[in-house]
């Protein structure tokens, strides 16, 4: 330890009433680095732990149950319950924002999650926020989507999902602001706005989604390695990556944050470089194919499929991949709801989402369509015998650019590991939140002294063993199963958010409440939520059709159905099981019976109008550039 002494073990000296308070550095020290979390001893100490305690002993002691007394919470912070609804790639960004505040909402409520340590710094949050969305769905899953739909179908699918997502962000932002301290976050909205059974089923399917993501990413990592070698058993790499992910999570939030900082730096640099290089290759400035332009939109074509029905199926199949790629984007509305001026931040977050959809997703997808033909035998999901690779690698390597594809593939591997790391971390925390909501056994609420939900982490680790199918010849089939579960689960969550918003607005109207009580009103209103809800139901119906009658086949296929639609039977089973167990057969909560007061923050309508008028006046009297920034940002 350094000469600054061990801040984590400062004791009461000579039993006096004077407390020695730890400095802000406490927040940066994980427990297993520090030792015991015991209550202050009545025996005098020199102000730090005795030196004869070994590092090994302190490490093993850190796995003991965390005490939940007031004196033991000096280093603990309230983990906001909204983490149950946050995507892995962004989940810890909210933890940081809560840590930055000295008066966290709901602090010291006695929740088990109070023991989770606050160790994430602003630099971590910045890179985690920027890297959100750059994962398997965008970097690898788009290969299968391109094969099924063609470049135009892929673009249409992402554009449709992008329009839906914008409405979801608006609805989520409105409810996140008024229910900012609700246990369970937006996974809890359906429970008191729609129906308890529906809320239970959606919450568990959402947890299952992130349980599936970890083995999905590990399988994807082994597939990414095949670009370099196919002679080594893929399970060897799965073991290496599996141990790496668990080791990172043994170090708790601090290990997660540092790993994500490195991973996301690499992802941002790679995507920026690919965008620039892709344009140069397409116009003939690099590679050996000269000017390419939109050649592949004519040969082999903009859509895959000889008949219109096959083309439609291709677009429908793309929507699930797009949902998986967009997964977690709703988190932006959650975090902005907790900033100093959320009423102004949420509209900015919606604009930010538009820019992310346009530049991060649609722009790179257009480039992929220009540079990679959908009939390439190297694309995942193709029937050719070529070595499968990410479409981003193929986009560069197939045009004669050397060395760079290896760097891109390496960064894609890091991106995949980043998602595996995030999903493992988050699935364990989801189990913790389900336990606090009463939806899971209390054993999952076990928190050790280092702030790790050990039992939940053990379940996540066992589930990740599915990844060892990587050596199986059915590897791509397993990838399809896991991707379908994750993608459909995301659609269920988004549908639940929009349906909850519709019920919330209906209850406000029936009970005679003014919308002026809301700190922020969705710019798309109930019509936007209705559009998003209807579109997602239609997508689920279309996906059902694709599942029972796969693309290119005219006959029904039971195996293909479960490969692509397994999440739906799981949701139905959970819903019916809850209804049978609780003998509760009502379909929904009546609008006049919905509790609009509990957990809700009610804003002063007159004060809001005054603030809005003052803001507009400042813009009118301020410099022109501020009006430009306000319009675009």
From Swiss-Prot:
<feature type="transmembrane region" description="Helical">
    <location>
        <begin position="532"/>
        <end position="552"/>
    </location>
</feature>
<keyword id="KW-0029">Amino-acid transport</keyword>
<keyword id="KW-1017">Isopeptide bond</keyword>
<comment type="similarity">
    <text>Belongs to the amino acid-polyamine-organocation (APC) superfamily. YAT (TC 2.A.3.10) family.</text>
</comment>
<feature type="transmembrane region" description="Helical">
    <location>
        <begin position="261"/>
        <end position="281"/>
    </location>
</feature>
<dbReference type="GO" id="GO:0005783">
    <property type="term" value="C:endoplasmic reticulum"/>
</dbReference>
<keyword id="KW-0472">Membrane</keyword>
<feature type="topological domain" description="Extracellular">
    <location>
        <begin position="374"/>
        <end position="402"/>
    </location>
</feature>
<feature type="topological domain" description="Extracellular">
    <location>
        <begin position="474"/>
        <end position="477"/>
    </location>
</feature>
<feature type="topological domain" description="Cytoplasmic">
    <location>
        <begin position="582"/>
        <end position="633"/>
    </location>
</feature>
<keyword id="KW-1133">Transmembrane helix</keyword>
<feature type="transmembrane region" description="Helical">
    <location>
        <begin position="232"/>
        <end position="252"/>
    </location>
</feature>
<dbReference type="InterPro" id="IPR004840">
    <property type="entry name" value="Amino_acid_permease_CS"/>
</dbReference>
<dbReference type="GO" id="GO:0006865">
    <property type="term" value="P:amino acid transport"/>
</dbReference>
<feature type="cross-link" description="Glycyl lysine isopeptide (Lys-Gly) (interchain with G-Cter in ubiquitin)">
    <location>
        <position position="11"/>
    </location>
</feature>
<dbReference type="GO" id="GO:0098718">
    <property type="term" value="P:serine import across plasma membrane"/>
</dbReference>
<feature type="topological domain" description="Cytoplasmic">
    <location>
        <begin position="426"/>
        <end position="452"/>
    </location>
</feature>
<feature type="topological domain" description="Extracellular">
    <location>
        <begin position="282"/>
        <end position="313"/>
    </location>
</feature>
<feature type="transmembrane region" description="Helical">
    <location>
        <begin position="353"/>
        <end position="373"/>
    </location>
</feature>
<feature type="transmembrane region" description="Helical">
    <location>
        <begin position="478"/>
        <end position="498"/>
    </location>
</feature>
<dbReference type="GO" id="GO:0015193">
    <property type="term" value="F:L-proline transmembrane transporter activity"/>
</dbReference>
<feature type="region of interest" description="Disordered">
    <location>
        <begin position="32"/>
        <end position="52"/>
    </location>
</feature>
<feature type="topological domain" description="Extracellular">
    <location>
        <begin position="146"/>
        <end position="148"/>
    </location>
</feature>
<keyword id="KW-0832">Ubl conjugation</keyword>
<dbReference type="GO" id="GO:0055085">
    <property type="term" value="P:transmembrane transport"/>
</dbReference>
<dbReference type="InterPro" id="IPR050524">
    <property type="entry name" value="APC_YAT"/>
</dbReference>
<dbReference type="Pfam" id="PF00324">
    <property type="entry name" value="AA_permease"/>
</dbReference>
<dbReference type="GO" id="GO:0015171">
    <property type="term" value="F:amino acid transmembrane transporter activity"/>
</dbReference>
<feature type="topological domain" description="Cytoplasmic">
    <location>
        <begin position="253"/>
        <end position="260"/>
    </location>
</feature>
<feature type="lipid moiety-binding region" description="S-palmitoyl cysteine">
    <location>
        <position position="633"/>
    </location>
</feature>
<feature type="region of interest" description="Disordered">
    <location>
        <begin position="86"/>
        <end position="116"/>
    </location>
</feature>
<keyword id="KW-0597">Phosphoprotein</keyword>
<feature type="topological domain" description="Cytoplasmic">
    <location>
        <begin position="170"/>
        <end position="197"/>
    </location>
</feature>
<feature type="transmembrane region" description="Helical">
    <location>
        <begin position="149"/>
        <end position="169"/>
    </location>
</feature>
<keyword id="KW-0564">Palmitate</keyword>
<feature type="topological domain" description="Cytoplasmic">
    <location>
        <begin position="1"/>
        <end position="124"/>
    </location>
</feature>
<dbReference type="InterPro" id="IPR004762">
    <property type="entry name" value="Amino_acid_permease_fungi"/>
</dbReference>
<keyword id="KW-0449">Lipoprotein</keyword>
<keyword id="KW-0813">Transport</keyword>
<dbReference type="GO" id="GO:0015192">
    <property type="term" value="F:L-phenylalanine transmembrane transporter activity"/>
</dbReference>
<keyword id="KW-1003">Cell membrane</keyword>
<feature type="modified residue" description="Phosphoserine">
    <location>
        <position position="6"/>
    </location>
</feature>
């Amino acid at each position: 330890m350094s000469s600054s002494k061990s801040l984590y073990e400062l004791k009461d000296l000579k039993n006096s009433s004077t407390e020695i308070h730890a400095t802000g550095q406490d927040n940066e020290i994980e427990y297993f680095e520090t030792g015991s979390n015991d209550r202050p001893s009545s025996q005098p100490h020199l102000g730090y732990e005795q030196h004869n305690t070994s590092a090994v002993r302190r490490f093993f002691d850190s796995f003991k149950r965390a005490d939940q007394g007031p004196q033991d919470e000096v280093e603990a912070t309230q983990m906001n319950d909204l983490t149950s609804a946050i995507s892995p790639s962004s989940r810890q960004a909210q933890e940081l924002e809560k840590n930055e505040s000295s008066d966290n909402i709901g602090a010291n409520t006695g929740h088990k999650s109070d023991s989770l340590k606050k160790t994430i710094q602003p630099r971590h949050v910045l890179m985690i926020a920027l890297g959100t969305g750059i994962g398997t769905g965008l970097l690898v899953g788009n290969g299968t989507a391109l094969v099924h739909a063609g470049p135009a179908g892929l673009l249409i699918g992402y554009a449709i999902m992008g329009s839906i997502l914008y409405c979801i962000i608006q609805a989520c932002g409105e409810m996140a602001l008024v229910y900012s301290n609700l246990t369970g976050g937006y996974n809890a909205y359906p429970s008191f706005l729609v129906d308890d059974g529906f809320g239970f089923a959606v919450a568990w399917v959402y947890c299952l989604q992130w349980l599936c993501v970890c083995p999905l990413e590990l399988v994807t990592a082994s597939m990414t390695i095949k670009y370099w070698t196919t002679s080594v058993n893929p399970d060897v790499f799965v073991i290496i990556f599996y141990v790496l992910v668990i080791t990172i999570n043994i170090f708790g939030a601090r290990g997660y944050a540092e790993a994500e900082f490195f991973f996301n730096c690499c992802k941002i640099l790679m995507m920026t470089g690919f965008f620039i290089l892709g344009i140069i290759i397409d116009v003939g400035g690099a590679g050996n194919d000269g000017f390419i332009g939109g050649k592949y939109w004519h040969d082999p074509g903009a859509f895959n499929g000889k008949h219109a029905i096959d083309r439609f199926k291709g677009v429908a199949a793309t929507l699930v991949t797009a949902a998986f790629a967009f997964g977690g984007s709703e988190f932006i509305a959650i975090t902005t709801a907790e900033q100093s001026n959320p009423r102004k931040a949420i509209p900015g977050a919606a604009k930010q989402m538009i820019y992310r959809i346009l530049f991060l997703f649609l722009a790179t997808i257009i480039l992929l369509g220009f540079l990679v033909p959908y009939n390439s035998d190297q694309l995942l999901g193709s029937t050719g015998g070529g070595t499968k690779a990410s479409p981003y690698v193929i986009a560069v390597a197939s045009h004669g650019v050397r060395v760079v594809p290896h760097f891109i593939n390496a960064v894609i591997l890091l991106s995949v590991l980043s998602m595996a790391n995030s999903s493992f971390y988050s699935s364990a925390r989801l189990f913790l939140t389900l336990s606090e909501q009463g939806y899971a056994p209390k054993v999952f609420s076990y928190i050790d002294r280092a702030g790790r939900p050990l039992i939940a982490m053990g379940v996540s680790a066992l589930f990740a063993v599915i990844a060892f199918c990587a050596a199986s010849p059915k590897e791509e089939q397993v990838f399809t199963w896991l991707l379908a579960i994750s993608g459909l689960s995301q659609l269920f969550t988004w549908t639940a958010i929009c349906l909850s918003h519709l019920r919330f607005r209906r209850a406000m109207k029936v009970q005679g409440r003014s919308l002026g009580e809301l700190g922020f009103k969705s710019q798309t209103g109930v019509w936007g939520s209705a559009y998003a809800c209807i579109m997602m139901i239609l997508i689920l119906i279309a996906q059902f059709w694709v599942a029972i009658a796969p693309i290119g086949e005219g006959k029904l296929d039971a195996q293909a159905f479960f490969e692509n639609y397994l999440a739906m039977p799981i949701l139905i089973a959970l819903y019916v099981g809850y209804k049978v167990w609780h003998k509760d057969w009502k379909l929904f909560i009546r609008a006049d019976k919905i509790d609009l007061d509990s957990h809700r923050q009610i804003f002063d309508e007159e004060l809001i109008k005054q603030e809005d008028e003052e803001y507009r006046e400042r813009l009118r009297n301020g410099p022109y550039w501020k009006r430009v920034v306000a319009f675009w940002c």
